[in-house]
């Protein structure tokens, strides 16, 4: 059993880990001071590519093309880049025990890693139907998407079941993006989800109606208000049918499940303060344990502009929280401080020829503006959310770069709105004036 010691350890191999490593390199680290420990076999990469370009039938994205930090226009950190920057990249290494009081991590093979400062960037893991005891959920070709190995399995299944039937369980981010890319791969696609409309945590019924009709026009079948209650398999163990709770049965060659995720915090249970399902941090991503920071999906942090604490699962926050934590660590070493994290919630998605962005908070009353006809070749519409007479959230489908910047400005500024009717009339021009 080997033992290694580092000044800093980043635990994780996703977006936050890559961006934290980049920020350490920017701030300056000595060779041998920093290690990144990941259970994955590849250097940190931009996870959003997995549900988009990685699955395209032509011109598919492949590593090293989307290693961190190309997603934000930054430097691509190849495996050799870490070495050049004096960072030890420790891959295919699963940490099974963390002792925060002893400042040590233990791997599945018994190796011990000591640290002075730890950044927890373990991210999330998908919720699996086997977790809920769904009958037959362990059949072959029932797939999930979180890591590059999952994406490789899906690519192989798409090739093997060319033109076959795919059932997508879940109507959120992953469900929508995967339904689109499976359809682009010419599979027969059916989406199944229990909610009354897709993306219910963000979309209003009006916004969802546009996307559901657009998807239907593209040949995606949508079944709402029910769940997958069981699966039957062929003699070779591959999934054959999906039983729905409402009594219907769907044929399936591939099933892709996207029913949510949970933060990977179990290593730290009982050692660190938690809140809202994540590890509680301050505005610098410091946890309740000295010299331990948590970033990305696992962090429950103060959302300053709303006077609230939240946990955010999105690539934008994963990048920015990682950078904030490292800046805070390095500033403190020099007896200085950085400004508190003041995050503006931001979400986006791309599917088919569509592209939307959302900034702010989706609370209060909402109004739709623009052309939301899903039959139009280039639909362009948006929405505002108004609470207490102020615009608190803004959404746009098909917006230009300048229009999307205007959305961010209006959500940050939270200007007063005379009336909902006036917002409908002004549309994106209201945001452009801020």
Curated annotation (Swiss-Prot):
Binding site for NADP(+): 173-177, 201, 260, 313-314, 348
EC number(s) recorded for this UniProt protein: 1.6.5.4
Residues that bind FAD: 13-16, 40, 47, 52, 95, 146-147, 297, 315, 348
Protein keywords: FAD, Flavoprotein, NAD, NADP, Oxidoreductase, Peroxisome, Phosphoprotein, Redox-active center
Modified residues (Phosphoserine): 416
Main location: other
Recorded GO CC terms: peroxisomal matrix
Binding site for L-ascorbate: 319, 350
Binding site for NAD(+): 171-177, 195, 201, 260, 313-314, 348
Protein localization: Peroxisome matrix
Family as reported in the entry's similarity comment: Belongs to the FAD-dependent oxidoreductase family.
Name used for this protein in its record: Monodehydroascorbate reductase 1, peroxisomal
Organism encoding this protein: Arabidopsis thaliana (Mouse-ear cress)
Annotated gene: MDAR1
């Amino acid at each position: 059993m080997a033992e290694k010691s580092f000044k800093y350890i980043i635990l994780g191999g996703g977006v936050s880990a890559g961006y934290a490593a980049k920020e350490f390199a920017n701030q300056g680290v000595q060779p041998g001071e920093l290690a990144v420990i990941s259970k994955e076999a590849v250097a940190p990469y931009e996870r959003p590519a997995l549900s988009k370009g990685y699955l395209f039938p032509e011109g598919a994205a492949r590593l090293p093309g989307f290693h961190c930090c190309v997603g934000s226009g930054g430097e691509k950190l190849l495996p050799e880049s870490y070495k050049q920057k004096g960072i030890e990249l420790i891959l295919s290494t699963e940490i099974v025990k963390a002792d925060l009081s002893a400042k040590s991590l233990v791997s599945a093979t018994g190796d011990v890693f000591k640290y002075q400062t730890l950044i927890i960037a373990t991210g999330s893991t998908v919720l699996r139907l086997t977790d809920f005891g769904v009958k037959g959920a362990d059949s072959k070709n029932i797939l999930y998407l979180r890591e590059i190995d999952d994406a490789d399995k899906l690519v192989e299944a798409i090739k093997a079941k060319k033109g076959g039937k795919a059932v997508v369980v879940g109507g959120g981010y992953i469900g929508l993006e995967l339904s689109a890319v499976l359809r682009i791969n010419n599979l027969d696609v059916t989406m199944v989800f229990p909610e009354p409309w897709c993306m219910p945590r963000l979309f209003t019924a009006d916004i969802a109606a546009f996307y559901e009709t657009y998807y239907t026009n593209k040949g995606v079948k949508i079944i709402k208000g029910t769940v997958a209650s069981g699966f039957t398999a062929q003699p070779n163990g591959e999934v054959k049918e999906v039983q729905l709770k409402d009594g219907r049965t769907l044929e399936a060659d591939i099933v892709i499940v996207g029913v949510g995720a949970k933060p990977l915090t179990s290593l730290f249970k009982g050692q660190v303060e938690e809140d809202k399902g994540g590890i509680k941090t301050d505005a610098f991503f410091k946890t309740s344990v000295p010299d331990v920071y948590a970033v990305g999906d696992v962090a429950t942090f103060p959302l300053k502009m709303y006077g609230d604490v939240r946990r955010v699962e999105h690539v934008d926050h994963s990048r920015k929280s990682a950078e904030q934590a490292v800046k805070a660590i390095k500033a403190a070493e020099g007896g200085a401080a950085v400004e508190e994290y003041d995050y503006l919630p931001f979400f986006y998605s791309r599917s088919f020829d569509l592209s939307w962005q959302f900034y702010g908070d989706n609370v209060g009353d909402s109004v739709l503006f623009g052309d939301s006809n899903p039959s139009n070749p280039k639909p362009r519409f948006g929405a505002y959310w108004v609470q207490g007479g102020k615009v608190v959230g803004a959404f746009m489908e098909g917006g230009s770069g300048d229009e999307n910047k205007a959305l961010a400005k209006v959500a940050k500024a939270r200007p007063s709105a005379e009336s909902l009717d006036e917002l409908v009339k002004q549309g994106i021009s209201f945001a452009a004036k801020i």
